[in-house]
Amino acid sequence: MLAAAPSAKPNRALLFGVFGTLFFLTLLLGAQTPPYNDGRQIIDPAENLIYRGSFGIPLAGGSVFYNPRPMFVSLVHVPSVLLRRGLSALFPAADSVIRTLTFHLVPAAILGLTGMLMIRFLLLIGVGVLAASLSTSALAFSTILFVYGRVVWSDILQAAMFWGFFSELVLAAREPGRGGAIKVGVWAGLLINTKYTFVLALPGAALFLALEAWPRLRARGLAALFAWTAVAFLPFVLFILWSNHHRWSDAFSAGYGGVPFQESLFWGLYSLLFSYGKGLFIYNPVLALAMHNHRLPNRYWLAIALVCLPIVLLYAKASDWAGDWSWGPRYLIFIVPVLMVPVAVRLNTWIEKRRYFLVGLFGVLAMTGVGVQLVGAGAYWDHFIRLSQATAFEWLGNPNRAGNYSNKHGAHCDPCYEDLHNHTYTPAFQPIEGNYWLLKHWFKGDRWEACEKDMPWRRYTSLPLASPKAFCSTIEVDWWFMPFRKNYRTAGRILLGFFIIALAGCLRLWVRGCRTCGGKGLAVASPGP
């Protein structure tokens, strides 16, 4: 495994500085879009719990809707709902903008937590503080974590909990003991409370821990290690059973319908990694460096194979591998922090050996990723997806959905190939290029005639398509300050100034923490027997 350099000690100033910097910068660049689709299903139960005392959403006719997702993904938003309730009581006329702002607090905080966990782990395994800081910054702002840190979806929570679990697993395997086992159990419990699919990670995690700890603990010590892990894990399982029974009157019912798994495993995996509209490396270019790392001992890759690969293969087999309406491969967001570690190790080697050209390569890929995420954050992804569907139907015809795998035969079907293949598989409707095209003309203030000339699909057809016109005229930058410019300009400026000052203070704390924590070197221990 990787061994920590003696001087690499993450301190409180560094950790809080990282958290605060990522939190306030994400808020500064935060969205104005209220929760839609999955976001509504996550935030509505939290709102209903605070305002009406019930987790269920009342529907017409007296029925009640329960979100089939684990209850935990909604409960984490309770603090923001409480804050909104308090502020709206003081300023009732501003409830709409208060609601938008407060609902984005928790995702931004979770992104900050992920970065804090990342830099802590990197320092503990011996990565130098400069490489650790640069890699943590890249994780937060040059990968899809940034886009999902701005919206009320559960994906950023999944990424944070998976990284917390995976990193503690690796640390516990390096130095097995009661404390590490308890941490692994707690993180495992939190993880499966974000998405039940992550249960697939647990057998591989147990096997990895057993393989690593066996030479030192043998049977009795290993049994004690797993016992402590189980004790910490059990309360979270009981919470799931209770929440299922509360919602469905059946502790073992998750409330989900059937999900088809009909995709070719090869093409599903290929599409998750390399497809035009959902490829992991298109949306996270800096992760390409993870695939070229040879200094990382095999045990880390063994952990990835045992813990992460079963989940990736399941998603590859799913007919809905693309994740519906979303930015990039959201089903793979959980593995993004995991793959950033080899990138950090590689970067640290380049810095130590003063290979500035290769350090520059990291910078180019990271800044390219920043550009990708800014394009994705600049306009809410639904806008271009709706545009691409309307344009494709006008250009290529309305598809025949009679044979699709859903029960929506003949109607619009979000997860179906007929409706989503255009922006998933074809370069004509690639979302990064599409969002860039929309934002470019919005910033220029162009009329439709100018927008029409360089539409991405103009490379393939000269037809005068009318569908995009309405979408181009309604595009607006997805930034929280935009509505404040119209009605609450003074309040908006005060908030803007507060975010900037808080960001500067946290950034200074980060720098001070770097100066005091040391840890310039990278120590690689023997990979073990």
Predicted feature residues:
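Membrane-proximal envelope and lipid/glycan-remodeling enzymes
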Residues: 1-529
